[in-house]
Amino acid sequence: MSFMERHQVALYLGSMIVGVACAGLSGWSYASEQLVPYALGALLWTNFALMPLTGMSVGQYKRLACTVVLTATFGTPILVAPLVSLFIPEGGPVALAAVIVLLAPCVDYVVVFTRIAGGEYRGLLAATPYLLGAQLIFIPVWTSIYAYIGILDTRVVGEIFPLPAESYLSLTPLIVPLVAAYLVQRWSTRSPQRQQTYERVRSMSDTAMIPLMCLLLALMCSAYTPAVLNETQLIPRLAGLYLTYAILAGVAAWFLSRAMSRAERISVTFSAVTRNALIIYPVVALCAQRLAHNGNPEAKLMGATVLTQTLTELLIMVAMTAIFRAAFQDRKIPQRLPNPGTPKNIERRPPHTGRPPLYKL
């Protein structure tokens, strides 16, 4: 194990501290925000390059894929409803933004964190298309249900749906690296020389994964910290909401998946806790513009609502990675030694020496 692999959690925390420290520099926050999609795309490329995409099918991970999709579609909304009512009882644009981000399971860097923590990351990748499809279908359904039962303001929900077509462009940092990695793997199967070239690419991708994760964490903290700190009255409630959700969802996912293997349980737990804020943020920003155009003064708080979830989740992911690595990685299974004692009711026999036994005459 290399130096970066042994100390990656400390490197992640250090990167986040550097990003927060650089957030106050003039123009740095804006530049960092522009670079986040590219850093995310590079990180996902290195992750996808290490996976056997051409030989992967959802049938290999059917149980895991079904579990994470059903959890995201039906389990998470049951938990989100009372939490949003408790922390944001107003039901306005802030509550709507929180609901949208909490109902969207992560499909990008959750794969990276799961791999680092020792989970079954290939199963999460196989479930990615189904998680994306479930989000597109069920987020409008659940937000409408929340509005009907009084958790969200019906007027606010009615003003944002259907989602603008530009919102689907937010999937670009995910789809482009995935398709590129798949095409390169298909290309490498044509000849042994291409396979050797791809093996070198895999080796470089494995080496670059931790530095790219550090870069992404630093850029995200630098880009989003100023917007979050500007809303000092709102942040404690939002941070409490997201932290409470992460704890309850993580504990519930871990214990409800106890029939699975340890790697699958880690994957289910990470999938239940991690949200799709990087993909959802442009969508929420477009919804905020629509509400602001209609004269809603709270629309400007929707962006900070999503960004608070991002920063809170980064700390939670780093902590979860450290916990799982400390608890499970490099743990040696003790071997059961034979019992040296001999039961009293069993006759002791002399060891076999290769010669016939001597008997007294």
Task: Identify what each model region corresponds to.
Residues M1-L361:
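Alpha-helical transmembrane segments of multi-pass small-molecule/ion transporters
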